[in-house]
């Protein structure tokens, strides 16, 4: 048995970043195949690879943090820095979509009819379904904060209740967003308006699904007594991510749904 004289976790070689990158490649390629050729084989393979990667990577992290005790205080501090940098990178990722939207909408070209929305586009009413979804996400932000405070106070029952409500709200948001896509009077192929609308809101919807999955894992871990008031970075990271998703949606709602209409 080896002994270490420092508090840092020396991570062993892991195949999951490689399989995660492979699954991302398969998913993007599969989406292209689905859009252009209506073939779902590559997309299904990408989804399967992604699910297997997530399961095994989460399994390893839970083993290292909960059962082997590798997530010491210095390690948790480094993980917080890493999560902060990841969220900052996501901010720049979405900044590109907002840039594309405002670049096109603030100075519309003659091809767009010199006005925004472009000629022939009927935008969605921001005071109907989009406002409902905004209320749902804001409510989920309240419930995830409730879950965090309950966990910090050692109230296991309320933590489980609040997490479950947050997951249900996230699922409801996703279902409403899907129904909105089906009922929208324009498509992703309807010029720059359709492209920016569906790509920006679609990637946000993907982040909601990822965040809901993250919170579902936290709920399962809470049921198995993995979290304590002083050791729950997995939950903390999920909560940060969920608040980030909330804030991005507010900017999307104000920019694309309200001002853009």
UniProtKB/Swiss-Prot annotation:
The keyword Mitochondrion applies. Its EC number is 7.1.1.9. It is a multi-pass membrane protein. Keywords: Membrane, Mitochondrion, Mitochondrion inner membrane, Translocase, Transmembrane, Transmembrane helix. It is an enzyme of class 7 (translocase). Residues 1-15, 67-72, 153-155, 224-232 are mitochondrial matrix. One of its GO terms (biological process) is respiratory chain complex IV assembly. The keyword Chaperone does not apply. The chain crosses the membrane at residues 16-34, 41-66, 73-105, 129-152, 156-183, 191-223, 233-256. InterPro entries: Cyt_c/ubiquinol_Oxase_su3 (IPR024791), Cyt_c_oxase_su3_dom (IPR033945), Cyt_c_oxidase-like_su3 (IPR000298), Cyt_c_oxidase_su3-like_sf (IPR035973), Cyt_c_oxidase_su3_a-hlx (IPR013833). It catalyses: 4 Fe(II)-[cytochrome c] + O2 + 8 H(+)(in) = 4 Fe(III)-[cytochrome c] + 2 H2O + 4 H(+)(out). Residues 35-40, 106-128, 184-190, 257-261 are mitochondrial intermembrane. GO terms for cellular component: mitochondrial inner membrane; respiratory chain complex IV. It comes from the Eukaryota. Component of the cytochrome c oxidase (complex IV, CIV), a multisubunit enzyme composed of 14 subunits. The complex is composed of a catalytic core of 3 subunits MT-CO1, MT-CO2 and MT-CO3, encoded in the mitochondrial DNA, and 11 supernumerary subunits COX4I, COX5A, COX5B, COX6A, COX6B, COX6C, COX7A, COX7B, COX7C, COX8 and NDUFA4, which are encoded in the nuclear genome. Component of the cytochrome c oxidase, the last enzyme in the mitochondrial electron transport chain which drives oxidative phosphorylation. The respiratory chain contains 3 multisubunit complexes succinate dehydrogenase (complex II, CII), ubiquinol-cytochrome c oxidoreductase (cytochrome b-c1 complex, complex III, CIII) and cytochrome c oxidase (complex IV, CIV), that cooperate to transfer electrons derived from NADH and succinate to molecular oxygen, creating an electrochemical gradient over the inner membrane that drives transmembrane transport and the ATP synthase. Belongs to the cytochrome c oxidase subunit 3 family. This is Cytochrome c oxidase subunit 3. It comes from Papio hamadryas.
